[in-house]
Amino acid sequence: MELLRTVSDTKRTFYALHTRPINTIYRRVVEELMVEMHLLSVNVDFSYNPIYALGVVTTFDRFMQGYQPERDKESIFSAICQAVEQEPQRYRQDAERLKAVAQSLPVNDLVAWLSQANHLQQDADLQAQLQAIASNPNFKYSRLFAIGLFTLLEQSNPDLVKDEKQRTEALKTIAAGLHLSDDKLSKDLELYRSNLDKMTQALAVMADMLTADRKKREQRQQQASTPVAPPNE
């Protein structure tokens, strides 16, 4: 019998793949995403789908905004995916494909498609996935899947997701069509949006601190380089 990989196994693999240190403010983001993906990957009811992939990519990209050095971000993302035995390129490609589909559709058509009220021909694979989700009583819902749905709506019509009434109605329609809990979906997305706001605020504070620190260093350097006049005899 094959032993299930543990969270410790996944973390060990990640840090073997990405050996550079991760900035403190982002380490929690990376580890929480990695643990969430790990727990899903070992769940018997979980199966990969492109909406989940879009949620993973969106979560990583949004919460890693401002990360320095910038060149390390793709290495970190790749290591997260490989640590849970997934292909990072598949996640990126599926996410880009779904965003392009969402951008090409009026939001009402997108909601009707996601809720399976209408079957559109834009993406046969996504259509098959949506049908499979709607007909699977054991579908493993996740916060990352919810973020994928939210991102699709956001890509189709950014104004809709900013309007609470329209956003709530769209999510309820989609949840009903896919047989998901609309209460769980809404709560997960409220938490996601709240955490994004907190991260934005934390980054702003950090940027202010760095600016203040840089100004102090410049002042010290300027003072050190200013010649001291000899005392008058």
UniProtKB/Swiss-Prot annotation:
Q: Which UniProt keywords apply?
A: Coiled coil
TM spans, by residue?
none
Q: Which Pfam families match?
A: ThylakoidFormat
Q: Which GO terms describe its cellular component?
A: plasma membrane-derived thylakoid photosystem II
Coiled-coil residue windows: 183-205
Query: Which superkingdom is the protein from?
Result: Bacteria
Which InterPro entries does the entry link to? Thf1 (IPR017499)
- Looking at the record, which segments are called Disordered? 213-233
Q: Name one GO biological process term.
A: photosystem II assembly
Provide the family line.
Answer: Belongs to the THF1 family.
Q: What does this protein do?
A: May be involved in photosynthetic membrane biogenesis.
**Record NCBIfam families:** PS_II_psb29
Q: What is this protein called?
A: Protein Thf1
Native source species: Trichormus variabilis (strain ATCC 29413 / PCC 7937) (Anabaena variabilis)
